[in-house]
Amino acid sequence: MLKNFKNFTLEDMKAKRLELKKEYLDLRFKSVVGHVENPLKKREIRRDIARLNTMICEYKLGIRKV
């Protein structure tokens, strides 16, 4: 699943990152306590968070214009 975050503003990126972090934390707890329906979802969310972190860092360094 390829996400397109390029059209997001900086505030949207930060909000989406926070949302994904909460979702990832919930999935981690579910995997420890019980059964997770889609175990690959954790990996997808983790990679999306990394993509957003990279884009936010690029914005701060002036590489990317939002």
From Swiss-Prot:
GO terms for molecular function: structural constituent of ribosome. GO terms for biological process: translation. Transmembrane segments: none annotated. It comes from the Bacteria. GO terms for cellular component: ribonucleoprotein complex; ribosome. Keywords: Ribonucleoprotein, Ribosomal protein. InterPro entries: Ribosomal_uL29 (IPR001854), Ribosomal_uL29_sf (IPR036049). Belongs to the universal ribosomal protein uL29 family. This is Large ribosomal subunit protein uL29. It comes from Borreliella afzelii (strain PKo) (Borrelia afzelii). The lineage of its organism: Bacteria, Pseudomonadati, Spirochaetota, Spirochaetia, Spirochaetales.
